Protein backbone atom coordinates (compact mmCIF):
# COMPACT_ATOMS: atom_id res chain seq x y z
CA UNK A 1 0.00 0.00 0.00
CA UNK A 2 1.50 3.32 -1.02
CA UNK A 3 1.88 5.94 1.70
CA UNK A 4 1.99 8.78 -0.80
CA UNK A 5 -0.50 11.63 -0.54
CA UNK A 6 -0.96 15.26 -1.49
CA UNK A 7 0.29 17.26 1.48
CA UNK A 8 -1.66 20.18 2.93
CA UNK A 9 1.03 22.69 1.92
CA UNK A 10 0.74 21.43 -1.66
CA UNK A 11 -3.04 21.86 -1.60
CA UNK A 12 -2.64 25.45 -0.38
CA UNK A 13 -0.10 26.22 -3.10
CA UNK A 14 -2.33 24.68 -5.77
CA UNK A 15 -5.25 26.72 -4.44
CA UNK A 16 -3.37 29.99 -5.01
CA UNK A 17 -2.74 28.96 -8.62
CA UNK A 18 -6.30 27.68 -9.13
CA UNK A 19 -7.99 30.78 -7.67
CA UNK A 20 -5.87 33.12 -9.79
CA UNK A 21 -6.88 31.23 -12.95
CA UNK A 22 -10.55 30.53 -12.12
CA UNK A 23 -11.54 34.15 -11.31
CA UNK A 24 -14.12 33.01 -8.78
CA UNK A 25 -15.51 30.11 -10.81
CA UNK A 26 -15.52 26.55 -9.38
CA UNK A 27 -13.92 24.92 -12.45
CA UNK A 28 -11.19 25.50 -15.01
CA UNK A 29 -11.60 24.78 -18.69
CA UNK A 30 -8.71 23.61 -20.86
CA UNK A 31 -7.79 27.09 -22.08
CA UNK A 32 -7.62 28.47 -18.54
CA UNK A 33 -5.42 25.62 -17.32
CA UNK A 34 -3.23 25.52 -20.43
CA UNK A 35 -0.89 28.33 -19.37
CA UNK A 36 0.18 26.78 -16.08
CA UNK A 37 0.30 23.21 -17.41
CA UNK A 38 2.42 24.16 -20.42
CA UNK A 39 4.91 25.93 -18.17
CA UNK A 40 6.00 22.41 -17.18
CA UNK A 41 7.41 21.97 -20.72
CA UNK A 42 5.87 18.51 -20.92
CA UNK A 43 4.77 17.41 -24.38
CA UNK A 44 1.19 18.03 -25.50
CA UNK A 45 0.66 14.27 -25.62
CA UNK A 46 1.69 13.93 -21.97
CA UNK A 47 -0.46 16.87 -20.92
CA UNK A 48 -3.45 15.35 -22.73
CA UNK A 49 -3.02 12.12 -20.78
CA UNK A 50 -2.63 14.04 -17.51
CA UNK A 51 -5.85 15.96 -18.26
CA UNK A 52 -7.78 12.76 -19.04
CA UNK A 53 -6.61 11.15 -15.78
CA UNK A 54 -7.33 14.21 -13.63
CA UNK A 55 -10.79 14.81 -15.14
CA UNK A 56 -12.29 12.03 -13.03
CA UNK A 57 -15.91 12.90 -13.78
CA UNK A 58 -15.18 13.37 -17.52
CA UNK A 59 -17.00 16.70 -17.76
CA UNK A 60 -14.23 18.41 -19.75
CA UNK A 61 -13.30 20.74 -16.87
CA UNK A 62 -11.21 20.51 -13.69
CA UNK A 63 -12.64 21.39 -10.30
CA UNK A 64 -10.18 22.16 -7.48
CA UNK A 65 -9.71 18.53 -6.42
CA UNK A 66 -9.07 17.45 -10.01
CA UNK A 67 -6.69 20.39 -10.52
CA UNK A 68 -4.66 19.19 -7.49
CA UNK A 69 -4.44 15.75 -9.09
CA UNK A 70 -3.26 17.23 -12.40
CA UNK A 71 -0.64 19.44 -10.74
CA UNK A 72 0.76 16.56 -8.66
CA UNK A 73 1.06 14.36 -11.75
CA UNK A 74 2.84 17.16 -13.63
CA UNK A 75 5.28 17.81 -10.78
CA UNK A 76 6.03 14.08 -10.41
CA UNK A 77 6.77 13.87 -14.14
CA UNK A 78 8.97 16.97 -14.12
CA UNK A 79 10.86 15.86 -10.99
CA UNK A 80 11.41 12.33 -12.29
CA UNK A 81 9.14 10.63 -9.73
CA UNK A 82 7.23 9.24 -12.71
CA UNK A 83 8.92 8.17 -15.93
CA UNK A 84 5.67 8.30 -17.91
CA UNK A 85 2.03 9.24 -17.40
CA UNK A 86 0.34 6.26 -15.67
CA UNK A 87 -2.37 4.40 -17.55
CA UNK A 88 -4.80 4.84 -14.66
CA UNK A 89 -4.98 7.16 -11.69
CA UNK A 90 -3.12 5.76 -8.63
CA UNK A 91 -5.44 5.00 -5.71
CA UNK A 92 -3.71 7.53 -3.43
CA UNK A 93 -4.47 10.34 -5.91
CA UNK A 94 -8.20 9.60 -6.24
CA UNK A 95 -10.30 12.27 -4.44
CA UNK A 96 -12.55 10.60 -1.85
CA UNK A 97 -15.64 12.37 -3.19
CA UNK A 98 -15.08 10.79 -6.61
CA UNK A 99 -13.93 7.32 -5.53
CA UNK A 100 -17.29 5.78 -6.48
CA UNK A 101 -16.94 7.11 -10.04
CA UNK A 102 -13.54 5.48 -10.44
CA UNK A 103 -14.73 2.21 -8.90
CA UNK A 104 -17.74 2.05 -11.18
CA UNK A 105 -15.60 2.83 -14.22
CA UNK A 106 -13.19 0.04 -13.33
CA UNK A 107 -16.04 -2.40 -12.92
CA UNK A 108 -17.41 -1.36 -16.30
CA UNK A 109 -14.02 -1.84 -17.96
CA UNK A 110 -13.95 -5.43 -16.72
CA UNK A 111 -17.47 -6.30 -17.88
CA UNK A 112 -19.31 -3.84 -20.14
CA UNK A 113 -23.08 -4.27 -20.15
CA UNK A 114 -26.09 -2.68 -21.78
CA UNK A 115 -28.53 -0.70 -19.63
CA UNK A 116 -31.17 -2.62 -17.75
CA UNK A 117 -34.59 -1.63 -19.06
CA UNK A 118 -37.70 -1.34 -16.91
CA UNK A 119 -40.78 -1.84 -19.04
CA UNK A 120 -43.42 -0.49 -16.68
CA UNK A 121 -44.03 3.22 -17.20
CA UNK A 122 -44.33 5.33 -14.05
CA UNK A 123 -47.41 7.46 -14.64
CA UNK A 124 -47.84 8.64 -11.03
CA UNK A 125 -49.04 12.27 -11.26
CA UNK A 126 -47.12 15.00 -9.48
CA UNK A 127 -43.69 13.37 -9.66
CA UNK A 128 -40.68 15.23 -11.05
CA UNK A 129 -38.17 14.17 -13.67
CA UNK A 130 -34.45 14.75 -13.23
CA UNK A 131 -33.23 11.80 -11.18
CA UNK A 132 -29.45 12.09 -10.67
CA UNK A 133 -27.23 9.07 -10.01
CA UNK A 134 -24.57 11.27 -8.42
CA UNK A 135 -24.36 10.66 -4.64
CA UNK A 136 -23.42 13.67 -2.57
CA UNK A 137 -20.93 12.79 0.21
CA UNK A 138 -23.47 13.58 2.94
CA UNK A 139 -26.09 11.31 1.33
CA UNK A 140 -23.58 8.54 0.70
CA UNK A 141 -22.49 8.63 4.34
CA UNK A 142 -26.12 8.23 5.43
CA UNK A 143 -26.65 5.29 3.04
CA UNK A 144 -23.54 3.59 4.45
CA UNK A 145 -24.81 4.00 8.01
CA UNK A 146 -28.07 2.28 7.05
CA UNK A 147 -26.15 -0.46 5.25
CA UNK A 148 -23.78 -1.04 8.20
CA UNK A 149 -26.69 -1.27 10.64
CA UNK A 150 -28.56 -3.94 8.61
CA UNK A 151 -26.02 -6.06 6.72
CA UNK A 152 -25.74 -9.77 7.45
CA UNK A 153 -22.57 -11.77 8.09
CA UNK A 154 -21.86 -11.88 4.33
CA UNK A 155 -22.13 -8.10 4.02
CA UNK A 156 -25.47 -8.31 2.17
CA UNK A 157 -28.89 -6.72 2.66
CA UNK A 158 -32.24 -8.49 2.31
CA UNK A 159 -35.42 -6.70 1.30
CA UNK A 160 -37.16 -7.44 4.60
CA UNK A 161 -34.26 -6.14 6.73
CA UNK A 162 -35.14 -2.55 5.77
CA UNK A 163 -38.85 -2.72 6.55
CA UNK A 164 -38.53 -0.16 9.36
CA UNK A 165 -36.96 2.25 6.90
CA UNK A 166 -39.78 1.74 4.37
CA UNK A 167 -42.33 2.55 7.07
CA UNK A 168 -40.64 5.91 7.74
CA UNK A 169 -40.68 6.99 4.08
CA UNK A 170 -43.32 8.67 1.96
CA UNK A 171 -42.89 6.06 -0.79
CA UNK A 172 -45.56 3.56 -1.97
CA UNK A 173 -44.77 -0.13 -1.55
CA UNK A 174 -44.98 -0.69 -5.31
CA UNK A 175 -42.28 1.91 -5.91
CA UNK A 176 -40.07 0.40 -3.21
CA UNK A 177 -40.33 -3.01 -4.87
CA UNK A 178 -39.74 -1.47 -8.28
CA UNK A 179 -36.52 0.13 -7.01
CA UNK A 180 -35.45 -3.21 -5.49
CA UNK A 181 -36.01 -5.03 -8.77
CA UNK A 182 -34.05 -2.33 -10.58
CA UNK A 183 -30.90 -2.89 -8.51
CA UNK A 184 -31.45 -6.66 -8.25
CA UNK A 185 -31.87 -7.83 -11.88
CA UNK A 186 -30.91 -11.40 -10.95
CA UNK A 187 -33.74 -11.57 -8.35
CA UNK A 188 -31.34 -12.65 -5.60
CA UNK A 189 -32.63 -12.84 -2.01
CA UNK A 190 -29.99 -10.29 -0.93
CA UNK A 191 -27.91 -7.56 -2.57
CA UNK A 192 -24.36 -6.35 -2.00
CA UNK A 193 -23.19 -2.99 -0.71
CA UNK A 194 -23.01 -1.23 -4.09
CA UNK A 195 -26.55 -2.28 -4.97
CA UNK A 196 -27.75 -1.27 -1.49
CA UNK A 197 -26.33 2.23 -1.83
CA UNK A 198 -27.99 2.62 -5.23
CA UNK A 199 -31.28 1.24 -3.83
CA UNK A 200 -31.25 3.75 -0.96
CA UNK A 201 -30.32 6.54 -3.36
CA UNK A 202 -33.36 5.73 -5.52
CA UNK A 203 -35.62 5.68 -2.44
CA UNK A 204 -34.17 9.00 -1.30
CA UNK A 205 -35.04 10.67 -4.61
CA UNK A 206 -38.50 9.05 -4.67
CA UNK A 207 -39.05 10.30 -1.10
CA UNK A 208 -38.25 13.81 -2.39
CA UNK A 209 -40.79 13.52 -5.22
CA UNK A 210 -38.69 12.33 -8.18
CA UNK A 211 -39.68 9.51 -10.52
CA UNK A 212 -37.86 6.22 -10.16
CA UNK A 213 -35.43 5.80 -13.08
CA UNK A 214 -36.22 3.23 -15.75
CA UNK A 215 -32.60 2.26 -16.42
CA UNK A 216 -29.37 1.63 -14.56
CA UNK A 217 -25.98 2.80 -15.85
CA UNK A 218 -23.96 -0.15 -17.07
CA UNK A 219 -21.14 0.70 -14.68
CA UNK A 220 -23.50 0.31 -11.71
CA UNK A 221 -25.02 -2.89 -12.95
CA UNK A 222 -21.57 -4.40 -13.41
CA UNK A 223 -20.68 -3.67 -9.79
CA UNK A 224 -24.01 -5.17 -8.62
CA UNK A 225 -23.55 -8.45 -10.49
CA UNK A 226 -19.82 -8.88 -9.95
CA UNK A 227 -20.36 -8.38 -6.22
CA UNK A 228 -16.94 -6.75 -6.02
CA UNK A 229 -14.93 -4.23 -7.96
CA UNK A 230 -11.72 -5.07 -9.83
CA UNK A 231 -8.88 -2.91 -8.55
CA UNK A 232 -6.22 -4.27 -10.91
CA UNK A 233 -4.56 -1.18 -12.38
CA UNK A 234 -3.85 -2.75 -15.78
CA UNK A 235 -7.52 -3.60 -16.29
CA UNK A 236 -8.97 -0.20 -15.42
CA UNK A 237 -10.09 2.70 -17.58
CA UNK A 238 -10.91 6.32 -16.76
CA UNK A 239 -14.15 6.74 -14.82
CA UNK A 240 -17.44 7.68 -16.48
CA UNK A 241 -19.44 10.62 -15.20
CA UNK A 242 -22.69 9.76 -13.46
CA UNK A 243 -24.25 13.20 -13.26
CA UNK A 244 -24.09 16.71 -11.89
CA UNK A 245 -24.39 17.71 -8.26
CA UNK A 246 -27.94 18.16 -6.99
CA UNK A 247 -29.59 20.36 -4.45
CA UNK A 248 -29.07 19.37 -0.82
CA UNK A 249 -32.41 20.65 0.44
CA UNK A 250 -35.73 18.83 0.55
CA UNK A 251 -38.41 20.33 -1.69
CA UNK A 252 -40.75 20.82 1.25
CA UNK A 253 -40.24 21.52 4.94
CA UNK A 254 -43.09 19.15 5.87
CA UNK A 255 -40.99 16.06 5.15
CA UNK A 256 -38.07 14.75 7.17
CA UNK A 257 -34.77 14.16 5.43
CA UNK A 258 -34.38 10.69 3.96
CA UNK A 259 -33.41 8.14 6.62
CA UNK A 260 -33.02 10.64 9.49
CA UNK A 261 -35.94 9.27 11.50
CA UNK A 262 -34.84 5.70 10.83
CA UNK A 263 -31.21 6.34 11.82
CA UNK A 264 -32.35 8.18 14.93
CA UNK A 265 -34.30 5.09 15.99
CA UNK A 266 -31.27 2.90 15.38
CA UNK A 267 -29.02 5.28 17.29
CA UNK A 268 -26.28 5.07 14.66
CA UNK A 269 -26.49 8.54 13.15
CA UNK A 270 -23.03 9.78 12.31
CA UNK A 271 -21.37 6.39 12.88
CA UNK A 272 -20.87 5.20 9.33
CA UNK A 273 -18.11 2.61 9.18
CA UNK A 274 -17.09 3.12 5.57
CA UNK A 275 -13.83 4.98 4.97
CA UNK A 276 -13.07 5.52 1.28
CA UNK A 277 -9.48 5.41 0.11
CA UNK A 278 -7.80 8.22 -1.74
CA UNK A 279 -6.93 11.84 -1.17
CA UNK A 280 -9.07 13.50 1.52
CA UNK A 281 -9.78 17.14 0.73
CA UNK A 282 -12.18 17.54 3.67
CA UNK A 283 -9.64 19.53 5.68
CA UNK A 284 -8.99 21.93 2.81
CA UNK A 285 -10.09 25.48 3.57
CA UNK A 286 -13.22 26.36 1.62
CA UNK A 287 -13.49 29.23 -0.84
CA UNK A 288 -15.09 31.71 1.55
CA UNK A 289 -12.45 31.04 4.24
CA UNK A 290 -9.40 31.44 2.04
CA UNK A 291 -7.48 34.66 2.47
CA UNK A 292 -6.81 36.55 -0.71
CA UNK A 293 -3.58 35.66 -2.38
CA UNK A 294 -0.92 37.91 -0.87
CA UNK A 295 0.48 39.00 -4.20
CA UNK A 296 -2.86 40.12 -5.57
CA UNK A 297 -3.76 41.93 -2.37
CA UNK A 298 -0.52 43.88 -2.16
CA UNK A 299 -0.65 44.68 -5.86
CA UNK A 300 -4.17 46.09 -5.47
CA UNK A 301 -2.98 48.18 -2.50
CA UNK A 302 -0.12 49.58 -4.55
CA UNK A 303 -2.47 50.37 -7.42
CA UNK A 304 -4.86 52.14 -5.03
CA UNK A 305 -2.02 54.26 -3.66
CA UNK A 306 -0.86 55.11 -7.16
CA UNK A 307 -4.37 56.13 -8.22
CA UNK A 308 -4.71 58.30 -5.12
CA UNK A 309 -1.36 59.97 -5.82
CA UNK A 310 -2.30 60.55 -9.45
CA UNK A 311 -5.66 62.05 -8.49
CA UNK A 312 -4.00 64.33 -5.96
CA UNK A 313 -1.45 65.41 -8.54
CA UNK A 314 -4.15 66.08 -11.13
CA UNK A 315 -6.17 68.08 -8.61
CA UNK A 316 -3.21 70.25 -7.63
CA UNK A 317 -2.06 70.73 -11.21
CA UNK A 318 -5.45 71.93 -12.37
CA UNK A 319 -5.98 74.24 -9.38
CA UNK A 320 -5.66 77.86 -10.62
CA UNK A 321 -3.59 80.49 -8.89
CA UNK A 322 -5.07 83.76 -7.71
CA UNK A 323 -4.23 85.36 -11.06
CA UNK A 324 -5.87 82.48 -12.95
CA UNK A 325 -2.61 80.82 -14.08
CA UNK A 326 -1.36 77.33 -12.92
CA UNK A 327 1.30 77.34 -10.19
CA UNK A 328 4.10 75.68 -12.17
CA UNK A 329 6.61 75.96 -9.32
CA UNK A 330 4.34 73.95 -7.04
CA UNK A 331 3.65 71.44 -9.80
CA UNK A 332 7.36 70.94 -10.40
CA UNK A 333 8.02 70.47 -6.68
CA UNK A 334 5.26 67.86 -6.32
CA UNK A 335 6.37 66.00 -9.43
CA UNK A 336 9.94 65.84 -8.13
CA UNK A 337 8.72 64.57 -4.74
CA UNK A 338 6.59 61.88 -6.39
CA UNK A 339 9.51 60.90 -8.61
CA UNK A 340 11.79 60.64 -5.57
CA UNK A 341 9.21 58.51 -3.77
CA UNK A 342 8.84 56.12 -6.71
CA UNK A 343 12.61 55.87 -7.15
CA UNK A 344 12.94 55.03 -3.45
CA UNK A 345 10.28 52.32 -3.81
CA UNK A 346 12.11 50.94 -6.84
CA UNK A 347 15.41 50.91 -4.95
CA UNK A 348 13.83 49.14 -1.96
CA UNK A 349 12.31 46.51 -4.23
CA UNK A 350 15.63 45.86 -5.93
CA UNK A 351 17.61 45.70 -2.67
CA UNK A 352 14.99 43.70 -0.78
CA UNK A 353 14.64 46.32 1.97
CA UNK A 354 11.66 48.13 3.46
CA UNK A 355 8.29 46.61 2.64
CA UNK A 356 9.88 44.25 0.12
CA UNK A 357 11.38 42.32 3.05
CA UNK A 358 8.16 40.64 4.15
CA UNK A 359 8.63 37.31 2.44
CA UNK A 360 7.97 38.44 -1.11
CA UNK A 361 8.97 35.91 -3.71
CA UNK A 362 11.16 36.61 -6.73
CA UNK A 363 8.30 36.71 -9.21
CA UNK A 364 6.41 39.36 -7.25
CA UNK A 365 9.55 41.48 -6.89
CA UNK A 366 10.12 41.36 -10.61
CA UNK A 367 6.53 42.35 -11.30
CA UNK A 368 6.66 45.23 -8.81
CA UNK A 369 9.98 46.43 -10.26
CA UNK A 370 8.53 46.44 -13.76
CA UNK A 371 5.40 48.27 -12.58
CA UNK A 372 7.26 50.93 -10.59
CA UNK A 373 9.81 51.29 -13.39
CA UNK A 374 7.03 52.04 -15.85
CA UNK A 375 5.56 54.54 -13.41
CA UNK A 376 8.96 56.24 -12.97
CA UNK A 377 9.44 56.50 -16.73
CA UNK A 378 5.96 57.95 -17.08
CA UNK A 379 6.65 60.52 -14.38
CA UNK A 380 9.97 61.46 -15.97
CA UNK A 381 8.21 61.95 -19.29
CA UNK A 382 5.52 64.00 -17.60
CA UNK A 383 8.13 66.14 -15.82
CA UNK A 384 9.98 66.74 -19.10
CA UNK A 385 6.76 67.89 -20.73
CA UNK A 386 6.04 70.24 -17.84
CA UNK A 387 9.54 71.67 -18.11
CA UNK A 388 8.99 72.32 -21.81
CA UNK A 389 5.71 74.06 -21.06
CA UNK A 390 7.38 76.11 -18.32
CA UNK A 391 10.22 77.09 -20.65
CA UNK A 392 7.72 78.07 -23.32
CA UNK A 393 5.81 80.24 -20.85
CA UNK A 394 8.99 81.96 -19.71
CA UNK A 395 9.94 82.58 -23.33
CA UNK A 396 6.57 84.14 -23.98
CA UNK A 397 6.97 86.34 -20.90
CA UNK A 398 10.40 87.53 -22.04
CA UNK A 399 9.07 88.29 -25.51
CA UNK A 400 6.21 90.26 -24.01
CA UNK A 401 8.61 92.25 -21.85
CA UNK A 402 10.87 92.93 -24.83
CA UNK A 403 7.98 94.32 -26.86
CA UNK A 404 7.13 96.73 -24.06
UniProtKB/Swiss-Prot annotation:
Ca(2+) binds at residues 55, 57, 59, 61, 66. GO terms for biological process: actin filament organization; endocytosis; endosomal transport. Residues 10-100, 139-227 form the EH domain. Its main location: membrane. GO terms for molecular function: actin binding; calcium ion binding. Residues 42-77 form the EF-hand domain. Keywords: Actin-binding, Calcium, Cell membrane, Coiled coil, Cytoplasm, Cytoskeleton, Endocytosis, Endosome, Membrane, Metal-binding, Repeat. Residues 313-324 have a biased composition (Basic and acidic residues). It is found in: Cell membrane; Endosome membrane; Cytoplasm, Cytoskeleton, Actin patch. The keyword Cytoplasm applies. Residues 306-327 are annotated as: Disordered. SUPFAM superfamilies: EF-hand. The keyword Membrane applies. It comes from the Eukaryota. Residues 281-404 form a coiled coil. Component of the PAN1 actin cytoskeleton-regulatory complex required for the internalization of endosomes during actin-coupled endocytosis. The complex links the site of endocytosis to the cell membrane-associated actin cytoskeleton. Mediates uptake of external molecules and vacuolar degradation of plasma membrane proteins. Plays a role in the proper organization of the cell membrane-associated actin cytoskeleton and promotes its destabilization. Belongs to the END3 family. Component of the PAN1 actin cytoskeleton-regulatory complex. This is Actin cytoskeleton-regulatory complex protein end3. It comes from Aspergillus fumigatus (strain ATCC MYA-4609 / CBS 101355 / FGSC A1100 / Af293). The gene is end3.
